[in-house]
Amino acid sequence: LAEDTEAIIHADQLGFDEAWVGEHLTTAAEPITSPLIFMANLIARTQQIKFGTGVICLPQYHPAVIAGYAAMFDHLSEGRFIMGVGPGGLPPDFELFGIMDADRNQMMVESIDMILKIWEGEPPYTIKGDFWNTHVEDWHVDKLGLGRMVKPFQKPHPPIALSALSPNSSTIRLAAKRDWDPI
């Protein structure tokens, strides 16, 4: 972790535009289990470099959690955030979360759609999907600020990058269709 930290600080000093940090929960070779937490450690220690998650494995989380965490990171970094997302990476991570046989591509699409609806919408929230549901109605009290999700610093949202394994993959077509960057 110290070596990765120093590499990103040095890259910032050299004028690099972006630093990308992956997410793996079940490998000693890449022990960064949360790119957002790791990169938050670097915000105050860098000047201009943008931070990209390479990638947040969306099927492993409820979309509302990622909407909140990503919006917070975007604020902390004052817009130096690129949200890289994907359907996952390592089979032991899939096994850990019980999603080995799940349609992770479809889970990813539903998740990012739900995240964007949260960021674009106003409470009360009722968003239904095949894999997740988000609902805040009974406890939406606007004058107290209850039931309101944080919006990102960048408007309408941080740039989105989507992992792709090959030039003909379904994720690269999705990235092109939605004007997202492939990574």
PLM-predicted stretches and their roles:
Residues E18, Q48-V55, R80-G84, P159-A161, ...:
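Structural preference for beta-strand elements that scaffold enzyme active sites
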Residues H24, G54-I56, G86-G88:
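Histidine-centered beta-alpha loop that forms part of the nucleotide-sugar donor binding/catalytic region
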Residues L1-F16, I82-G84, A102, L116, ...:
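C-terminal amphipathic alpha-helical "assembly" element
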Residues H62-R178:
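Internal, glycine-rich beta/alpha segment that forms the wall or movable "lid"
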Residues E23, G54, L96-M100:
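Short amphipathic alpha-helical segments at helix-loop
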Residues T27-I32, I56-H62, M100-D101:
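Glycine-rich "substrate-gating" loop/helix at the edge of Rossmann-like oxidoreductase active sites
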Residues E30, G54, L58, G147, ...:
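Residue-level detector of alpha-helical hydrophobic segments embedded in or interacting with membranes
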